[in-house]
Amino acid sequence: MNGISARKRRVLRPYAIRKPKGYLARAPGDLVEVDTLDVRPLPGVTIKHLTARDVVSRWDVVKASTTGTAAAAARFLDTLESRAPFPVSGIQIDGGSEFRGVFETECQKRGIRLFVLPPRSPKLNGHVERAQRTHTEEFYEVTDCCFEIAGLNAALEEWERVYNTVRPHQALGYLTPQEYLECHWPHLRRG
């Protein structure tokens, strides 16, 4: 034996689990898909774009960061909870390193169920993947904002407002996410 193993080690996750087959998101906040996207606006410049999308209402929360660490993703939970007009009870993530460690611990502290996808299955996170395409096409490809993080986050926050309150969504019968929430979930707290 040469000590080399062809088997990959399985990463143990203390809190995150696979989403049960029967788990359905019935109300806003039941399942929020979170993912990161590398945005390269200029040669040699990489920005980590975090997106959270509620699968019921299509409400999005977006933020840019200079790093794709678990600590940055954990800070994004504060942004998500402050900007979403509903409590978040479940988050679905891919197996990226930014969603381990501090992020997982923070979800556990907050009582948020954390579901991790099997490797190489982005189609199972389809809502947030589609949201990232929209943000790329309708924000990053047309924006004139500077790509310094504070200025970019201010522009992203305005884009998020437009996306959630002005831009109609075909999947919601051409309502905005805010109109959808007001029509179908009028009891939710307002952001």
Roles of regions detected by a PLM:
Residues 52, 127-136:
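A structural motif
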Residues 90-95, 109-127, 143-147:
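RNase H-like polynucleotidyl transferase catalytic core
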Residues 1-53, 71-75, 86, 191:
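Mobile-element integrase/transposase regions
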Residues 62-86, 90:
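Active-site beta-loop-alpha junctions of metal-dependent nucleic acid enzymes
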Residues 67, 113-117, 137:
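Basic nucleic-acid-binding interfaces
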Residues 7-24, 101, 110, 121, ...:
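C-terminal domain-tail junction helix/linker
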Residues 36, 55, 67, 95:
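Residues immediately flanking
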